[in-house]
């Protein structure tokens, strides 16, 4: 089986349906003895250019391990789902399980680093 990284963009009007879509696509992979190594919901983000007169869309990243038949079924599901504006599939050499740079940035913004807090405390005294 091969490893793939898939990013798909969902129409913002369908954002509440994203969790159901993710579950459906995860089931397609696991039903055929595949694995989902990483699954990240990046949320609603600004698009670089208009797609179908839409400025924002909901992004989802999946790293999976599956055979060609399963990948074909997934891509077929993406093509015939009107809520999915775009999708991209990349073949990877090995499974990727570490958080993506997008998620690392968000975690860094949401929680200050303990080392920085220690510095601030030391400087204050």
UniProtKB/Swiss-Prot annotation:
Compositionally biased residues, Basic and acidic residues: 116-125
Keyword RNA-binding: yes
Protein's name in the database: Small ribosomal subunit protein bS6
Pfam families: Ribosomal_S6
GO terms (BP aspect): translation
Listed Gene3D superfamilies: 3.30.70.60
Coiled coil stretches, renumbered: none
A Gene Ontology term for the protein's cellular component: cytosolic small ribosomal subunit
Region entry Disordered, spans: 96-125
Family: Belongs to the bacterial ribosomal protein bS6 family.
InterPro entries (alphabetical): Ribosomal_bS6, Ribosomal_bS6_sf, Ribosomal_S6_plastid/chlpt, Transl_elong_EF1B/ribsomal_bS6
Lineage of the species this protein comes from: Bacteria, Pseudomonadati, Pseudomonadota, Betaproteobacteria, Nitrosomonadales
PANTHER family in alphabetical order: MITOCHONDRIAL 28S RIBOSOMAL PROTEIN S6 (PTHR21011), SMALL RIBOSOMAL SUBUNIT PROTEIN BS6M (PTHR21011:SF1)
Domain of life: Bacteria
Function: Binds together with bS18 to 16S ribosomal RNA.
Keywords: Ribonucleoprotein, Ribosomal protein, RNA-binding, rRNA-binding
Gene Ontology MF terms in the entry: small ribosomal subunit rRNA binding; structural constituent of ribosome
Chain's gene name: rpsF
Organism: Nitrosospira multiformis (strain ATCC 25196 / NCIMB 11849 / C 71)
